[in-house]
């Protein structure tokens, strides 16, 4: 069945002299094309993902490539049934990705060698290499390369400290690194080199490029890839599907993410529909009884019902 929409994932490190002006012009163009998505702009470049029809996305790619410094930008493209976003945002940030370094890394000056998907696939099977996932823990939990090391981090900016604390795991090895589309690895691999690690390379175009490449078709990837749009998760491995995600409550195989019903928590957890219903869409007892619980409000549950449900159905106060 033909899909009428596309999602574009892209980034480019290139100097932008006036990010605010660039943002305003960019937002105006995106709105003129009825595109939806999220784009970050900084003095160091652009990082975006957006959705639109075939014609709209073609026009956008032509537009961006027509701008000085963006002529060779690499777009990762997914065909989808509908828009993957509900709004259009273009925002200015200090950095495209935040490593919170005292001495920032400029990927235009130092970054790891780009490995095409087939090269990365071959390196994955080399016993002298270790593979570090440069994403957050909840992204890893949904899917990752077989044998990859999981940094226990909630935010990208925590990665350098985690590496320093765990350097014995890979100090004598060649390091491979990867992320969703490549933007985080540009800085992370450069930082690794500056720190003196032996970096074998970074996956060019990220997991997305690896999954769509005819040379690899996602081999040695387990689970799904987390994406920052309304799809939440997409398939990568075209040859087999190994579920690695586990239900937060039951530890059973699960690939369904929800946000905790407590808006002050908002923790992302993997939960089946049955678990979501049983635990009122919340990660803990405190979140279940929170006065602003979104799950409770959405289902018009009374306080008495919530307390009775907890007393009758939950043996432990998870």
Curated annotation (Swiss-Prot):
Catalytic residues, chain numbering: 179 (cysteine persulfide intermediate)
Keywords of this entry: Oxidoreductase, tRNA processing
Protein name: tRNA uridine(34) hydroxylase
Family: Belongs to the TrhO family.
Purpose: Catalyzes oxygen-dependent 5-hydroxyuridine (ho5U) modification at position 34 in tRNAs.
NCBIfam families noted in UniProt: PRK00142.1-3 (NF001135)
One Pfam family per UniProt: Rhodanese_C
GO MF term list: oxidoreductase activity, acting on paired donors, with incorporation or reduction of molecular oxygen
Signal sequence interval, chain numbering: none
GO biological process, one term: tRNA modification
Gene for this chain: trhO
Domain of life: Bacteria
Transmembrane segments annotated in the record for this chain: none
């Amino acid at each position: 069945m033909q899909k009428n929409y596309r999602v574009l994932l892209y980034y480019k490190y290139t100097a932008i002299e006036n990010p605010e002006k660039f943002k305003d012009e960019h937002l105006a163009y995106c709105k003129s094309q009825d595109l939806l998505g999220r784009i970050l702009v900084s003095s160091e470049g652009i990082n975006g993902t957006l959705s639109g029809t075939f014609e709209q996305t073609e026009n956008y790619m032509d537009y961006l490539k027509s701008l000085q410094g963006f002529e060779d930008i690499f777009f990762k493209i997914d065909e989808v049934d509908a828009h993957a976003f509900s709004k259009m945002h273009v925002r200015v940030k200090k950095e495209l990705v935040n490593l919170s370094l005292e001495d920032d890394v400029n990927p235009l000056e130092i970054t790891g060698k780009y490995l095409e998907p087939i090269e990365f696939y071959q390196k994955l099977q080399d016993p002298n290499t270790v593979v570090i996932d440069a994403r957050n823990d909840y992204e890893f939990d949904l899917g990752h390369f077989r044998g990859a090391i999981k940094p226990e981090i909630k935010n990208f900016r925590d990665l350098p400290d985690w590496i320093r604390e765990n350097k014995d795991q890979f100090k004598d090895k060649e390091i491979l690194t990867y992320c969703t589309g490549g933007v985080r690895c540009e800085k992370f691999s450069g930082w690794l080199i500056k720190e003196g690690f032996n970096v074998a390379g970074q996956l060019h175009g990220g997991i997305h490029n690896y999954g769509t490449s005819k040379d690899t078709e996602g081999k040695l990837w387990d689970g799904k890839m987390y994406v920052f749009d309304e799809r939440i998760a997409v398939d990568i491995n075209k040859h087999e599907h190994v579920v690695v995600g586990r239900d937060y409550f039951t530890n059973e195989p699960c690939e369904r993410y929800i946000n905790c019903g407590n808006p002050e928590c908002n923790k992302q957890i993997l939960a089946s529909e049955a678990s979501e219903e049983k635990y009122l869409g919340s990660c803990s007892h405190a979140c279940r009884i929170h006065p602003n619980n979104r799950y409770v409000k959405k289902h018009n549950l009374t306080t008495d019902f919530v307390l009775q449900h907890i007393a009758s159905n939950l043996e432990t106060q998870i």
